[in-house]
Each structure stands twice: as C-alpha cells, then as structure tokens.
Amino acid sequence: PWTCFFAEIDAIKEIDFEKELWLDSHGYSALDDQTMFYKAWLRGIKTAVVPDAVYQHLDAKTSTKNNKPAFLYSSVYNRIIFWHRFIFKQQHCFGKVWSVLCIGYRLFWMLLLDIIDLIRNRMTYKELKIKIKAFVDGCRYLHSKEYQKMDLVC
C-alpha cells in the first residue's frame, strides 16, 4: 500500500517538488506520491511500477498514534489543491467544465459515503466535521495570495 521509489537526481530536480510545500502544510503530506508522479508524467519522465517488490517501510507518519485527524484533514485539503493546480488549471474551456463535474461527482459520493459511515458508526461526527472544514479551507486557499503567486505547473 505504500510507495517506494528510486530516481535519478536530475529527474527529481526536474520535478521541482520544492514548489509543492502546500502538501506538508498541515502535519501530514497526503497525496505527495500522487503529486510527484503526476509532475513527473507532465514533464515526460518515465516511471515504472514493480508490484511484487518487497521492502520495509520505515515511517511516513502513518504509524504515529492519534494521527487520524491530520490524515483526514490533509487528504481532503490536498485533494482540492491537487485538483485545482494539476487538473483544472491545465484544461481549456470544455476541459474545465468537465473537471468541475468530475470533482463534484467525487465530492458528492465522498460525502454520501461518509454520511453512511457516520450512520453505521464507522466514522464520528468529529471526523466528518474535520473533512468538511478541510474542504472549505482548501477552497479558501485557492483564492489566497499565496496560492495565486504559485507558478503554473506545466
């Protein structure tokens, strides 16, 4: 379930990951692997997956106790930023409309399934509130001066 990667130094430098500090702004860098691989793909850097590789994953804060609130918050917050930065901004008129419909569809089902989990006691009301707050905060960040100053990804 985790990612382990090896890369050439020049390829990592070309990804320019330093410009994605927003990923780690809330104590848990959710979607960092997705962002790294997507930026590599945008730049034409080839990647390969070895599905049967065996390695010992030391820690990426996943083993830290009481980390669930930070994970929930960052997962939703970072997904909104990722969508806007890498999907929405890269599209033309029709693509932008389509990407809004797609993220809306995903968010609708995420909320519906979260409500079902809440009813089935698989999620607490506090956890649902964290996810909703992360969504609102992520949308607000899209309008912030800090976000507006970021370079385009291409």
Task: Give residue ranges: language-model regions.
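Nucleotide phosphate-binding site architecture
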Residues: 12-13, 22, 56
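Conserved nucleotide-sugar donor-binding
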Residues: 3-16
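Short aromatic/basic micro-patch
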Residues: 6, 30, 49
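Non-catalytic, C-terminal membrane-associated alpha-helical segments of glycosyltransferases
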Residues: 70-78, 91-154
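Catalytic beta-strand/loop signature of glycosyltransferases that borders the donor
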Residues: 44-59
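Nucleotide-sugar-dependent glycosyltransferase catalytic core
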Residues: 27-29, 56-77, 125
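Acidic donor-binding loop at a coil-to-helix junction in glycosyltransferase catalytic cores
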Residues: 2, 22-38
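Active-site phosphate/pyrophosphate-handling residues
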Residues: 10, 35, 54
